[in-house]
Amino acid sequence: TEGSAWQNSFAVPHDIEGLAELYGGREQLMRKIDELFAEKPHYEVGGYGREIHEMTEMAAADFGQCAISNQPSFHIPYIYSALGEVDRTAYWVEKLCKEAFSYADDGFPGDEDNGTMALWYVFGVLGFYPFCPGKPEFVKGRKQVKRAFLCGREIDADSFDGNIIPYSALV
């Protein structure tokens, strides 16, 4: 689909520990993600026969192979946190929010796709993310706003210990 082998190699949010085992352990998996961010943006047009906008956007954003302009990469910066390294997630999410998004007319790094791009940004600045679909929890990042309210209640992702926030604690 719209992801490459780079992005799809990490598409296992339901078994991140198993993925880490396949890479030889947590540290090796995190090193591979470091490599993903450091790698020059490159791609093959393959069956498309031409460069499509997702390819152009990934190269323009210049976050290596993390094509934050497209859904297959949305969870990638949060893998660090899922493995217990919240600060590494916070670094990349803050950098992406500040450098890839803006309030300009073209302020999203990719197409909006029914709100997914905006919601990724909102989760990023709130400091948590629904890492695994269907699992009632969020992984932590670091909040980038002074105060936030959800359903009339103030929420503060930074006030939770550890790297996981139960869904019930926020909603």
Residue ranges and their predicted role:
Residues 1-149, 153-154:
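Active-site core of glycosidic bond-cleaving carbohydrate-active enzymes
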